[in-house]
């Protein structure tokens, strides 16, 4: 299972009841943070996410409402006693941005590994996240902006009959199921000797900030959860959305429908949007399985058996 928490669902400026953009994913104790707006640490503390052992931080773009919480978080991580490497992924400019932050943070006893502007699919050189495939897409915003898709792959189902038939020692079963090749007593053992049919993973996609460009539906296709910006609830605000390169509730829902996703989570609401629920029908009339984001909303995604 995968646990996801929307730490902040606001856009532009923080509000008393709405912190800025941030999403936290916990998969088997491995932790991923997507964006880090103001208030992120407060929500993390309230939800007991933990700071020390974040494995990966992904930044969509370098507007303040998505990164102004990162400086403080890097400092807090340092003060937690962390010494292992921390990987940060982001668009063009992320290296210079992190370098500037690093100059302001007094104590960083860990190495920052930065991946700038990755294209297409990639996996991390990280044993604990080896089953995670990440994809990026260039979005249409006022500055360089990345959308992310996280595909949590599953190892194929273990086939005990196959393992027995191939006379594989039981002490090797777990490692082979994890995908390792093993030599024991001069004999080679490979994963295909114990593995059966493939199992479906879980796909989580996120796009913010952007207009609803044609490439998004294919990028988010068949996602179990699609997290999408929805800056404006009222259809009458479409001119603002076009001008500021954001989306309305209805536009986000249309992307979810075109992408054949299972569930849509709306986030990144304008400060002028006092009661987002007033406009929820603008989304549900297009895509029924729509959830309205709120700070510290938690969701659990389960793997199919």
UniProtKB/Swiss-Prot annotation:
Catalytic activity: Endonucleolytic cleavage of RNA, removing extra 3' nucleotides from tRNA precursor, generating 3' termini of tRNAs. A 3'-hydroxy group is left at the tRNA terminus and a 5'-phosphoryl group is left at the trailer molecule
Names of required cofactors: Zn(2+)
Residues involved in Zn(2+) 2 binding: 65-66, 209, 268
Top-level enzyme category: hydrolase
Catalytic site positions: 65
Keywords in alphabetical order: Endonuclease, Hydrolase, Metal-binding, Nuclease, tRNA processing, Zinc
Family: Belongs to the RNase Z family.
Note on how the cofactor is bound: Binds 2 Zn(2+) ions.
EC number: 3.1.26.11
General function of this protein: Zinc phosphodiesterase, which displays some tRNA 3'-processing endonuclease activity. Probably involved in tRNA maturation, by removing a 3'-trailer from precursor tRNA.
Subunit structure: Homodimer.
Pfam families: Lactamase_B
A GO MF term: 3'-tRNA processing endoribonuclease activity
Protein name, per record: Ribonuclease Z
Keyword Repressor: no
Binding residues for Zn(2+) 1: 61, 63, 141, 209
Highest taxon of the lineage: Bacteria
């Amino acid at each position: 299972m995968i646990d996801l928490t929307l730490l902040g669902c606001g856009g532009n400026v923080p509000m008393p009841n709405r912190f800025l953009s941030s999403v936290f994913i916990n998969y088997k104790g491995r932790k991923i943070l997507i964006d880090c707006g103001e208030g992120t640490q407060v929500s993390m503390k309230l939800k007991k996410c933990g700071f020390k052992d974040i494995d990966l931080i992904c930044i969509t773009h370098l507007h303040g409402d998505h990164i102004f919480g990162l400086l403080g978080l890097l400092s807090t991580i340092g003060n937690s006693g962390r010494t292992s490497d921390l990987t940060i992924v982001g668009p063009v400019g992320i290296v210079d941005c992190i370098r500037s932050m690093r100059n302001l943070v007094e104590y960083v006893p860990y190495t920052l590994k930065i991946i700038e502007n990755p294209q297409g699919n990639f996996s991390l050189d990280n044993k604990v996240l080896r089953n995670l495939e990440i994809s990026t897409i260039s979005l249409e915003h006022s500055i360089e902006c990345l959308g992310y898709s996280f595909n949590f792959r599953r190892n194929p189902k273990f086939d005990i009959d196959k393992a027995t038939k191939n006379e594989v020692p039981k002490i090797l079963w777990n490692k082979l199921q994890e995908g390792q090749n093993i030599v024991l007593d001069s004999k080679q053992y490979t994963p295909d000797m114990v593995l059966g049919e493939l199992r479906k993973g879980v796909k989580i996609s996120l796009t913010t900030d952007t207009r609803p460009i044609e490439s998004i539906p294919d990028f988010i296709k068949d996602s179990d959860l699609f997290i999408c910006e929805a800056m404006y609830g009222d259809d009458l605000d479409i001119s603002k959305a076009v001008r500021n390169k954001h989306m309305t509730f209805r536009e986000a829902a249309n992307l979810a429908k075109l992408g054949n996703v299972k569930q849509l989570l709306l986030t990144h609401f304008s400060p002028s949007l006092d009661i987002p629920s007033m406009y929820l029908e603008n989304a549900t009339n297009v895509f029924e399985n729509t959830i309205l984001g709120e700070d510290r909303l938690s969701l659990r995604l389960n793997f199919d058996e």
